[in-house]
Amino acid sequence: MGRVGAGGTAREAATGSLLLLLLLLARPPPAAASNSKESEAGLVSEHFSQAPQKLSFYSWYGSTRLFHFRVPPDTVLLRWLLHVSQGSPSCTDEEITVHFRYGAPPVINPLGTSFPDNTLSHASFHIRALLSTLMLDNTSVNISHPAPGDWFLVAHLPPSSQKIQVKGFVPTCAYIFQPDMLVMRVVEVSTLEPDVPLPQTLLSYPSYLKIFVPEYTQELRLELQGCVSSVSPGCPVRVTVGATTLPRNFQRVLTCTGLAPSCHLLLSSPPWGRWLQVTFESLAEPHVTVGFTAKAVFTVCRPWSVTIHHLIQNNPNQTYDTSAIQLSQSAVHRDLGRSSRVDSGPFCLLNYPVLREDTDVVSVHFQPLNGAFVLVHSSMPSVMQLRLDTGMDSGGSFIIVLRTNKTEVTNGTLVAACVNAASPFLSFNTSLNCTTAFFQGYPMFLRASSHMANLIMPFPETDNWYLSLQLVCPESPEDCEQAVVRVETILYLVPCLNDCGPYGQCLLLRRYGYVYAGCSCKAGWRGWSCTDNSTAQTVAQQRAAALLLTLSNLMFLAPIAISLHRSFLVEASVYFYTMFFSTFYHACDQPGEAVLCILSYDTLQYCDFLGSGASTWVTILCMARLKTILKQVLLVLGTLVIAMSLQMDRRGIWNLMGPCVFAFVIMASMWIYRCGHRGQCYPTSWQRWVFYLLPGISMASVGIAMYTSMMTSDNYYYTHSIWHILLAGSAAFLLPPREEKAGSWACLQKFPCHYQICRNDRDELYTVT
């Protein structure tokens, strides 16, 4: 089982020799030189590492950092060394959480949100430690006898404060995380063959065996016979069967400490088609020899496969539709009874072949070959094998839906179903707990009062999964002898459940070649599939937010009117551009029902940011009172520079503030020049300062302070609306008076609205008579 430990001094990166030394120190010291050499010859060490990643504060699954490792077979010891560094000594001491899981990415819930109904959500195995603790010590996680295959680590910082940070305005701190994996595996492993006794002798070091479990194994009996000790009577041996998995571990341990020379371990439904690790350890004192004989006995049954051949024989004149492809009850009982008399043994299950159809990335559909229905009997379970073993199926959500007609399940009958990994559950006649040798399955039931059951499995483990169903009559078993229930199965793998609903967005995430999915929620909705509405906005709140963010842009009508009145036609055009695209960008940016997008979201966002920067640019240049030609050139060049900087980094604050600061320098230089040239302060009127410049500067300062330090995800809709009002209001106050030679609405007077008689000065070339 995993355990957290510390050792060594702080390191930015550990060398391979140091890592190997740490791994070797984790093992007990040798009892004898000869035995140590013999043990060292059968063990090899390997080291794996991945590129470091920058951690983020947790808001949804996409803000975590995923690491994917593959543990080789026959590994007896695994150690993760967790390295953390910071980008600056001034970084705060944050808590770092690391989750571990075998077979699939960990299912985590740092925010404590609710999952959808019938969703499996086991607590993940994780460790938490402060940054200072991780940097002072080499924090490690050790796992004995880990399961071979895919292992996943997920690391993140504490939940975010929901504050909207402006990139580049406030210095950020980088927290870098890198795990190293060290394994020690056995290269000399004896194979325990079925029904063949294998003598073993233990001294100080364990003995490692492996057993191959064939398909359709009902039971495995592991026996220790003739166990003797050189000093004391009894059998001081501990047997560990299976591998360690996280977050749930189903390793089986047998301790033979009695006086009897034999003991055994019985495993029901062991994992099919794979090697099973067995470790024998001596519990006697050092230098005490323990000898015994190990033996594995299998109980194997035969499956009855429902194939197309059987279906054709039972229904020769019918087509393959849902109603026609049904296995006759009498034919099943007749064939099973005739075949069970063969010497090869009785049937233990009814096997339904399954068609796997890959439809998209992390999208698979399963369907029985004979249609969507499965016939469920009381004599034996009906089993479907669901292959989720490609290594790319563990990044989505696996949904299982079972349905039956209300008339087929009576009050005294019950359809019991179990979903298990590695091997199916076959013991419905004795228990309904869905427990196999190394896995706790997930039960599902169909009753007269509930004719539908569903199960949602986020991030299913990479394995062969089995769905087994059987008809059970707890009160009167004789009622089930001739009964057959037809169950409809809907089995599919999708990236996100219901595509994260109306208040979420399903996003595909990638770590090297591994693809997984997560839900990004909006409008206050939270949870794994954006179904937790504990902090959600109501429809009225959503509409109010949309109206505030869009209608607040009408404040730009004031600077537009003032610009036209003072003959600033270019400035009025820029303000209108900003008002138009800011309005429709925020109409498209809303979650839920209040959404209106006239262009793509990315285009609207770019135009909104460009309008904000250009509005500030033209306002400051207008205040500088430059000559017309120079002013027009700077207006065009500045807008082009802002457009280029937004293309490079749209959310970088200095990409917008840089050109605006340059414009402010130009304005300040012109004002200082006029002050020196005229011998008095510019602008000269105190009314201009008191009633226009100071209010405009105050509104701009408050708006910038609010934009950079006060916005959060919760108050965004009204703080950003105030930002719109302050930005437009400051532009209206800061615009300078019109030129002395220009009259009011002079630009509009250039567009006459009446007829004019024009004199034709061209010469007549010819005359028409």
Swiss-Prot record:
Source species: Mus musculus
In which domain of life is the source organism classified?
Answer: Eukaryota
List the Extracellular topological domains.
34-543, 589-603, 649-651, 710-715
Q: Which family does it belong to?
A: Belongs to the TMEM8 family.
Q: What is this protein called?
A: Post-GPI attachment to proteins factor 6
* Places the protein is found: Cell membrane; Lysosome membrane
The record describes its membrane topology as: Multi-pass membrane protein
Its taxonomic path starts at: Eukaryota, Metazoa, Chordata, Craniata, Vertebrata
Concerning PTM, the database record says: Glycosylated.
- Gene Ontology terms for molecular function: phospholipase A2 activity
Q: Which reaction does it catalyse?
A: a 1,2-diacyl-sn-glycero-3-phosphocholine + H2O = a 1-acyl-sn-glycero-3-phosphocholine + a fatty acid + H(+)
Outline which residue ranges sit on the Cytoplasmic face.
565-567, 625-627, 673-688, 737-769
Null mutant: what phenotype?
A: Embryonic lethal with anterior-posterior axis formation defects in embryos from 6.7 dpc on until cessation of development at latest in 10 dpc.
The record's annotation in InterPro entries points to: EGF-like_dom (IPR000742), NGX6/PGAP6/MYMK (IPR021910)
| Record gene name | Pgap6
Q: What does it do?
A: Involved in the lipid remodeling steps of GPI-anchor maturation. Lipid remodeling steps consist in the generation of 2 saturated fatty chains at the sn-2 position of GPI-anchor proteins (GPI-AP). Has phospholipase A2 activity that removes an acyl-chain at the sn-2 position of GPI-anchors during the remodeling of GPI. Required for the shedding of the GPI-AP CRIPTO, but not CFC1, at the cell surface. Shedding of CRIPTO modulates Nodal signaling by allowing soluble CRIPTO to act as a Nodal coreceptor on other cells.
Span-the-membrane segments of this chain are 544-564, 568-588, 604-624, 628-648, 652-672, 689-709, 716-736
